[in-house]
Swiss-Prot record:
Zinc fingers classed as C3H1-type: ranges: 233-260
Biased composition (Low complexity): 101-117
Record InterPro entries: AtC3H46-like_PABC-like, AtC3H46-like_RRM, Nucleotide-bd_a/b_plait_sf, RBD_domain_sf, RRM_dom, Znf_CCCH, Znf_CCCH_sf
Start-end of Basic and acidic residues biased regions: 574-589
Domain of life from the UniProt record: Eukaryota
Gene Ontology molecular function: DNA binding; RNA binding; zinc ion binding
Region of interest called Disordered, as start-end residue ranges on this chain: 62-123, 552-624
Name of this chain's protein: Zinc finger CCCH domain-containing protein 22
Species annotation: Oryza sativa subsp. japonica
Domain RRM: 366-442
Chain coiled-coil ranges: 487-522
Chain intervals with Polar residues compositional bias: 613-624
The entry's keywords: Coiled coil, DNA-binding, Metal-binding, RNA-binding, Zinc, Zinc-finger
Amino acid sequence: MDAYEATKVVFSRIQALDPDHAAKIMGLLLIQDHGDKEMIRLAFGPEALLHSVMAQARKELALLPPPPPPSSSSPTVPAAHSPFLLSRQNSGRGPAPSPSPLSASSPSSWAQAQPFSRSNGSVDEVVGAGEELISPANSGGGAAANAPPFFPRGGDVLLDDFQLQEQLAFLNEGGVNPSHPLQGFDGAECRSPGPGEGGGMFPYGLGWANGGPGHRRSASVNELCLGGGSSDGFGWKPCLYYARGFCKNGSSCRFVHGDDAAALTGAAMDAATAEQQQCQDFLLRSKSQRLGPAAFPYSPTGSLPGSPSAATKCLSLLLQQQHNDNQRAAAAAALMLGGSDEAHKFMGRPRLDRVDFASMMNPGSRQIYLTFPADSTFREEDVSNYFSIYGPVHDVRIPYQQKRMFGFVTFVYPETVKLILAKGNPHFICDARVLVKPYKEKGKVPDKYRKHQGDFSGCTTPTGLDGRDPFDLHQLGARMLQHSNSTNEMMLRRKLEEQQQAAELQQAIELHSRRLMDLQLLDLKNRAAAAVTTAMAMTIPTANAFGSSQPLATTMVESPPDSGEQLKGTGYFTEERKMVNGGGDKEESAGEASLNADSDQSLEHNLPDSPFASPTKSSVSAHQSFTTTDTGVVATSSCSASHVGISAGTNAGGGINHLRPSTLDIPSPRDFFSVSSRLASDHGAIGM
């Protein structure tokens, strides 16, 4: 319960007691502003506390008290039957009757209902304390000097000390040091009654110097107003440890043991009210734990930060109880409707399994990943309203950018995620097609996927991490997308990485282009060699298919048809070959040069005696060596020079000297080429 609801409860209670002056009294209480804790305590406190506050407010506003009700003269109710008194099971003290705190007591009535004590002393220990209880019938005299901490006047010292005590209550087990009591207060005057002594108005006090064990908690709702008396022998709440099988406190436990239905009659609250009390108690404790270190920064315990795990555990337990209550309610409804299948489905799991509890602590199991078009116009509220059909939605996160195409939805229970994924795709939100995918934490991707990614994506960052890895988006995106500064930093980082990648890609392209240029240069050299090989493979004379006596290919000399020029052509062949060998093969070894010279000499020595004689076997081998070694040189020189050319086709006309064979038997092309290249006589044309 928050302060707003507590204020409404207090106003309704004041209006029930004094409807004429309720608005003025409530206005004064709001103007004084004693804090949310005091308002909540007043909302759940006994009527004696409320009467005291109203009496003090009427005194300050100079208002007349309302006429007493007819039942005010009734006898006092024993403490054992008062519904507003505290009770604890197995407290070790028997019940002791005491007057009701609503009675108009004498100045010694403070002894029967001591509000300020922590030692839980008996009535005999506090008899004789002459303090006065403020009540509607006794609100004058010295009441302002002994005002409760809710009042601003006459109780400033009390108020400061009480606030100090509330801040220290959770930092020390046994209270403060007994050697430093509060000045102005006796230990005997600051005792609160035990469980059966009738005091329950102010559950906190100043009895630190009494040596008794101090309460470590402030006035929680479950200790103020909803418990049976100590004579009943039980409290209002069952023991959870005993229900699970074993309670370490044994008979001294403050909660109920056993399955007796009569022992649970003191539980006057339903489950919703109990959860509100637990939440309120948790909030009060956390607030006091925050105030304690702030009030005493130099204390040994004040500098210790609060444990965040305790708050997480409390909230998780509250969620677990709420889920269990919802399942019980659903099972009860299914039983009432007569559906056994539905009842079995809900009753099969009365509590959360350990796996489900772990999944509750892990937000990844309660999230889904959404993808949708960039031109979608729906908002986070629309997404939350749509998916609330399947279950309660905890959070919706859609990145704030111009072209949004993904988002995340977090649910309260992981079962909702399973239900949505089982339904399949697509989903339509505001006429936009939305696809749902399971949420995967990129930090837990198997190694094989990382290896594949490392093979196909180059590492570009100096730290060795791939900037294109979506680890940043999913692992840190939940927090980074919520803050614009972090989003800008992430965008700048990605831009820098993209520029780095572009620069490295450009360098790779330039390096590849250089390699291609080198390959092209090598290709030009290879083309020259290929041209030589092609010239070698050309067949100069080819036989006529029909046995014609005229060859299809002849060798011609374009110089004038005199014998001197033809002889000069032979010398040109040798000079050209020498020039090619000398200019193109400068790095040729001496052995290769001598080999070429020997081949030429052997060729000259193997010339036949008569030009009309057929070549010998030795000359044939020499001719073969000549053709294999020097044909490329001749072909290359013939391409560049204008003296010798090779023409194909039949030449029927005159004007060109033809080398005609003497008979119809056409020699082999190798022999013909060897003989035709050998011009040793002064004749114009030599016929075979």
